[in-house]
Amino acid sequence: MSAPRILFLFNHDAAHQAAHIAGLAAAVARRGVAEVIIAYGTPTIRAVVEGLLSPGDAAKMQWAPLDLTPVLDTALAPLNRVAPVRRLARLVRHRALFASVDIIVSPERTCLRVKRALGERAPRFVFVPHGAGDRSVTYHPEMAQFDLMLVSGQKVVDEMGAHGIMPPERCRIIGYPKFDTVDMTERPRFFGNGNPVFLYNPHFDPYLSSWYDMGHAVIALFAAHPGLNLIVAPHVMLFRKKLHYSLEYRTMRRRPEIPAGLPANIRVDTASERLFDMSYTRAADVYIGDVSSQVYEFLAH
């Protein structure tokens, strides 16, 4: 009997979900009980995933780029600023790859389009949440289409059951895999002083985020108090688009820009890997946020 083929799906335009399943892929590869396929959306995503793995673990895996044709990629670029059309196009273009495996492990639910399209030919789909947040979208009815959920704790099991999404017997508590990719004893330092460090972590959703109405006021408060350090580190998707639309709340808003001329006690990062590798949550003394599960990552230290 041949070994099962397990595909770990990294199909996003940003790399913030990678650390939630990369370690699981490594653990399966080390056991040698299955073929492990890493399906990735962009070269940047691959680089981030490889950075989370040891060279030995990476060598045990098959790497499958979810490429689009240059013409299609270019044609979708304008629409992709508003909706995740490239992500959806990859799922259609590489449907044969998905049909060739036994299990697909994903940190988000877009992949369920593949399951519905393949019907009886579909592999089993396993969900690993990219975080442990409590937004209503976490309990979207589509989530019931997953065959198994690997979750961080009993809270998630209870809530999935309470919302009629997943019975307890189809959930497994595995902890928070992202913690396995980070040295929790290290505390990064971003300011040349011993002043308290506040982390401001606004979300991108225009209905839920504080950035649209209060972001500039938060920055102004710290600009007026140089004895307090502020790291402005929003959800990585906030500054990837100027116009944000919330499917969940049917709300669209234009994102305000970062104000100019900020003092030295304010650090702004809108695009680097530090936004999601826990550098800032480990550095902070105080967390200011909206709905992100980064609050749990802050509490972990």
Which functions belong to the PLM regions below?
Residues 1-3, 29-33, 96-101, 119-120, ...:
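Flexible, charged surface loops at secondary-structure boundaries
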